Amino acid sequence: MNQGIILLGIKHCGKSTLGNLLSKQFHCPFFDTDDVITEMTGLSPRQIYQEQGPQAFMEAEAKACNYLVRYLSALGEKEYVIATGGGICNNTEALEALASLGFFIFLEVPEAVAAERIIQEIEWEDGKMKNLPAYIAKENPVTTEDVARIFSGFYQQRTKRYRQLAQITCPLQGESPEENCQLIQQALFSQDCRWS
C-alpha cells in the first residue's frame, strides 16, 4: 500500500513550503502538482485558468495527477509528499488519482492568515489590482476589503470540502514553517501513521 502524504488546503496555507520540509525530514521525494502542470504545459496554473478557463485548468491538473501516479508507480516509490493546488478539492478526477497514492492531510490555517497572505501579494498597476488568484480577480475587486470578502466565501466553501476529503486535519496557527511542520508530524503521530 502506498503511504504518500498528499497536502490539501487553501491557497497560501503553506502546502509547498511544508511539503518540502516534510520530505526533507522523512528523506523522501517531494512533488508539487502546480509545478508538474507547469512542466507539462509550459504555462503556470494561473495562466491556464485565466487564458483558457477553469475547465482547461482542471483537465491540466487531472493530467498532472495521473502523470504522478504513473511516474511514482514506474519508480516503485511508496513514500513521498505531494502538495496540491488550492482548488483541487473541486477536481474529482485529480482527487481520485491522488487517493491511490496515499492519504490526504488538510492544512487548516485561520481565514485571516490566508487572506492576509493573498493581500500581501497584490500588485497595483494603474490603480488596478494584479497578481490575484483567478477566482478573486474575476469578481473585479476594487479594494483589499473586497478581496478579503470574496476570499471569505471561498474559504468557507473549500474548508468544508477539505474536511470531507482529508483523513487528517491539521490546524496550523500561522507559526513558522518549522513549527507548523512539527504540528503535522504530531497529527501523523496521533493517527498512528507509519510516518510518525
Segments (PLM) and residue ranges:
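ATP-binding Walker
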Residues: 13
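Post-Walker A helix-loop "phosphate-sensing" segment adjacent to the P-loop in P-loop NTPases
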Residues: 24-33
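P-loop (Walker A) phosphate-binding loop of NTP-binding proteins
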Residues: 10
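A glycine- and Lys/Arg-enriched "phosphate-lid" helix/loop adjacent to the NTP-binding pocket
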Residues: 103-157
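NTP-dependent small-molecule kinase module
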Residues: 2, 21, 78-79, 144-196
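ATP-dependent small-molecule kinase phosphotransfer cores
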Residues: 35-99, 124, 130, 134-140
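Hydrophobic anchor at the beta1->P-loop junction of P-loop NTPases
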Residues: 7
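Walker A/P-loop
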Residues: 16
